[in-house]
């Protein structure tokens, strides 16, 4: 009984991909990868399974979201929860030589366990890049520009890249509230975009009115109305001021790339990915309630694999990108040749000719079809080679 109950069910958060959606994903994937490769990024693959003690613990994904299993030797493995940590492992162990930046790209599925069915997938496809070994703001600008170019090649026209600096937020919070525990509470409000809760929490803190005002002023440092001078005046530490300088330099570089029209600065931007150390960014598109992609600088991650190197990168959620594109569920154009036994050779030759022309062609024996009317609705056009005459 239990076996029959789950016969057509899938594990929580898992999805099937039907032909029409697969075709859309393939087109989007190919367009993005072609663009990424023109920037000199090289595609790599990493294993679906990684050791929990290395990649699993280094990943910024919460432990309860990891799919865990044991191998034959009793080692705990995880299905990769993101691609940044596996690529950091690979770069640190096999590829990176100090002073020689790496430009790597990937197209892979990642896995994150869901506690309940809420419409969020437990497996999804990501396309992204990692620039490893280059600590300059120019590298951040390049990564963001690659992402924008790839999204445009995929067909996305209306989107916004929101850019911030986690170093700025951390510097401001630590100099006012004094310790990481209190700062993490404030960051959580910002990550959840719970600005009402943030304001109420700030007002409840035992701080001077001046410091409370500084924390509240942070919420106004975004969009076209803010200036970098305002951001710099709000923070006192050198680390915070350097973060503002980084963003100024980044803005100038993005203007040179000609992509500043889709970029906006938001000094409140934080991420749930704990390994980010500097500039970070998210991509938002119309009609999609979540970021379709994100990225940033993670200069301390490779150090966890015993190889110190700066790095920056991005990842795009293909499922959310397709939602943003609003692609119609049109099936790909596939022709069909329906033939009878006496015209089998003729049908094979015709199909071969059409395929040489780049067309997609199904070859179907008439005896294998039960309902010709229903079958014919799947293909266009259909060529019939039956008996001694040909109908179209």
From Swiss-Prot:
GO CC terms: cytoplasm
Xref: InterPro entries: aa-tRNA-synth_II, aa-tRNA-synth_II/BPL/LPL, HisRS-like_core, HisRS/HisZ, HisZ, HisZ-C
This protein's record includes keyword Amino-acid biosynthesis: yes
Keyword terms of this UniProt record: Amino-acid biosynthesis, Cytoplasm, Histidine biosynthesis
Gene3D superfamilies noted in UniProt: 3.40.50.12590, Bira Bifunctional Protein, Domain 2
Classification via SUPFAM superfamilies: Class II aaRS and biotin synthetases (SSF55681)
Pathway(s) annotated for this protein in UniProt: Amino-acid biosynthesis; L-histidine biosynthesis; L-histidine from 5-phospho-alpha-D-ribose 1-diphosphate: step 1/9
Miscellaneous comment in the UniProt entry for this protein: This function is generally fulfilled by the C-terminal part of HisG, which is missing in some bacteria such as this one.
Family: Belongs to the class-II aminoacyl-tRNA synthetase family. HisZ subfamily.
Name of this protein: ATP phosphoribosyltransferase regulatory subunit
The organism of origin for this protein: Geobacillus sp. (strain WCH70)
